[in-house]
């Protein structure tokens, strides 16, 4: 019901009367979002889409007189298209255009607070998922992005023409700092480029952060001296406060470590952007772990797709980001995974619905983020990983290194031999997807470490249907 007063009509009216604008043509400066929405029974999809646009921009549940004090046409979000999701009942893709002025420059926190901060609890919707975002170039240029990017990292490491190799130290909790450093040294001297703190290693009673940093740096320097290669370990500086996080980052810089790590979702985008700026200013590479992501992105009809989180991380800043494996133990469907991997590291990506890319995205020469494939992978996966992810990636073997019967260093050697064999075969023109098994078996003849690893893991598979498919 509406009540008319002079120059103002109070009351409640349908959202679609104001926020559903199918005639609107999005501007180059608009931020575009695609939502998958499931309206409540009886709610028209156009009304639901308009409600999403309203509640994530300027609207509220009733008309307010202060609308007269601004230009709503300039600032409101607009639902400009609603289309059914193919093959699904009562699900719709809702496309919303947001004016650039709604967002603070250089703030992922503000963007997400606006777009997903409140509307996901809206009663008119049974479920809502943010599938994709198109960041306009005008907004992209207000962000620093990754501290350094893929090319600068390769130049610093002096490593080209192949993926990088890593390993997460296990057990993830319980080791003393000295034993932890020993495990790092064995992996690095065996042939890995990096080792890594797990996401929940911070500063616990069994291993305080400063002790870990010192023993790990000693291991890095010893392995570098023995191998003649640049090595690194992702020291996790995630902490309870930004001040403590930066203190740990400062100490890492002082002892000479090349790379640190942050849990960007549990730590938050404000903390992550702060750390990324510090890393740019102080010459540290920044590895990003996505701990907690599946809470947000795993359900197909509600939450936020990981491609959105990956795009936001590229803006916020990170040189590496975990991206799934396609072939390992963690969720990842090939075409969809490669869609957001390209969004992480390429400069320009065209719309391609078959890969889940709803908008063309131009990153305006912002440095790329290196995808990190980790979770349940071992030497038999190496040909597929090289073929799927290409050179600009980091292949992270945890159990696939430390589980070797002969120990950490032979496990690392097995992975390095498998990788080098696959790269040589690829460069010779062989088809790794078809001949990969033969390539690995041939390499076993001159690497006993690889032969033992292949025998141990020959039956290990993780074959479950992916939850998130299009």
From Swiss-Prot:
One of its GO terms (cellular component) is carboxysome. It holds the Pfam family RuBisCO_large_N. The modification N6-carboxylysine is found at residue 196. It catalyses: 2 (2R)-3-phosphoglycerate + 2 H(+) = D-ribulose 1,5-bisphosphate + CO2 + H2O; D-ribulose 1,5-bisphosphate + O2 = 2-phosphoglycolate + (2R)-3-phosphoglycerate + 2 H(+). Gene3D superfamilies: Ribulose bisphosphate carboxylase, large subunit, C-terminal domain, RuBisCO large subunit, N-terminal domain. Its cofactor is Mg(2+). The active site is at 170 (proton acceptor), 289 (proton acceptor). CDD domains: RuBisCO_large_I (cd08212). GO terms for molecular function: magnesium ion binding; monooxygenase activity; ribulose-bisphosphate carboxylase activity. Keywords: Bacterial microcompartment, Calvin cycle, Carbon dioxide fixation, Carboxysome, Disulfide bond, Lyase, Magnesium, Metal-binding, Monooxygenase, Oxidoreductase, Photorespiration, Photosynthesis. Its main location: other. The keyword Ribonucleoprotein does not apply. Mg(2+) binds at residues 196, 198-199. It is an enzyme of class 4 (lyase). Binds 1 Mg(2+) ion per subunit. The record marks 329 as: Transition state stabilizer. It comes from the Bacteria. The disulfide bond which can form in the large chain dimeric partners within the hexadecamer appears to be associated with oxidative stress and protein turnover. Coiled coil: none annotated. Belongs to the RuBisCO large chain family. Type I subfamily. RuBisCO catalyzes two reactions: the carboxylation of D-ribulose 1,5-bisphosphate, the primary event in carbon dioxide fixation, as well as the oxidative fragmentation of the pentose substrate in the photorespiration process. Both reactions occur simultaneously and in competition at the same active site. Heterohexadecamer of 8 large chains and 8 small chains; disulfide-linked. The disulfide link is formed within the large subunit homodimers. The basic functional RuBisCO is composed of a large chain homodimer in a 'head-to-tail' conformation. In form I RuBisCO this homodimer is arranged in a barrel-like tetramer with the small subunits forming a tetrameric 'cap' on each end of the 'barrel'. This is Ribulose bisphosphate carboxylase large chain. The gene is cbbL.
């Amino acid at each position: 019901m509406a009540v008319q007063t002079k120059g103002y009509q109070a009351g409640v009216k349908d959202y679609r009367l104001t926020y559903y604008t199918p005639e609107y043509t999005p501007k180059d400066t608009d931020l575009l979002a695609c939502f998958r929405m499931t309206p409540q029974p009886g709610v028209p999809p156009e009304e639901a889409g308009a409600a999403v646009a309203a509640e994530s921009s300027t609207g509220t549940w009733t008309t307010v007189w202060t609308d007269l004090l601004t230009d709503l046409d300039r600032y409101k979000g607009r639902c400009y298209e609603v289309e059914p999701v193919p093959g699904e009942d009562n699900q719709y893709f809702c496309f919303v255009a947001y004016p650039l002025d709604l967002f603070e420059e250089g703030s992922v926190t503000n963007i997400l607070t606006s777009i997903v901060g409140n509307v996901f609890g809206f009663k008119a919707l049974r479920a809502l998922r943010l599938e994709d975002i198109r960041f306009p170039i005008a907004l992209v240029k207000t962000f620093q992005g990754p501290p350094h990017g893929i090319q600068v990292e390769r130049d610093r490491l002096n490593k080209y023409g192949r993926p990088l190799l890593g390993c997460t130290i296990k057990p993830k909790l319980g080791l003393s700092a000295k034993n932890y450093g020993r495990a790092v040294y064995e992996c690095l001297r065996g042939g890995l480029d990096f080792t890594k703190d797990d996401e929940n290693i911070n500063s616990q009673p069994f291993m305080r952060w400063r002790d870990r940093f010192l023993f790990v740096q000693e291991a890095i320097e010893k392995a570098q001296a023995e191998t003649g290669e640049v090595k690194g370990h992702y020291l996790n500086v995630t902490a309870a406060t930004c001040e403590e996080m930066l203190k740990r980052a400062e100490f890492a810089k002082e002892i000479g470590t090349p790379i640190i790590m942050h849990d960007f979702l549990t730590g938050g985008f404000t903390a992550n952007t702060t750390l990324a700026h510090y890393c740019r200013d102080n010459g540290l590479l920044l590895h990003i772990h996505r701990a907690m992501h599946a809470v947000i992105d795993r359900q197909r009809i509600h939450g936020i797709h990981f491609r959105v989180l990956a795009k936001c991380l590229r803006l916020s800043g990170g040189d590496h980001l975990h991206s799934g494996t396609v072939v390992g133990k963690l969720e990842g469907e090939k075409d969809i995974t490669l869609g957001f991997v390209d969004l992480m590291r390429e400069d320009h990506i065209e719309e391609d619905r078959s890969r889940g890319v709803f908008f063309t995205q131009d990153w305006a020469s912002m440095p790329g983020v290196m995808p990190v494939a980790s979770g349940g992978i071992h030497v038999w996966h190496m040909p597929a990983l090289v073929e799927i992810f290409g050179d600009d990636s980091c292949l992270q073997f945890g159990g696939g290194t430390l589980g070797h019967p002969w120990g950490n260093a032979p496990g690392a050697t097995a992975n390095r031999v498998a990788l080098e064999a696959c790269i040589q075969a690829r460069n010779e023109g062989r088809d790794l997807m078809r001949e990969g098994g033969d390539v690995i078996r041939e390499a076993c003849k001159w690497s006993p470490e690889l032969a033992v690893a292949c025998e141990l893991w020959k039956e290990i598979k993780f074959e479950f249907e992916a939850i998130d498919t299009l």
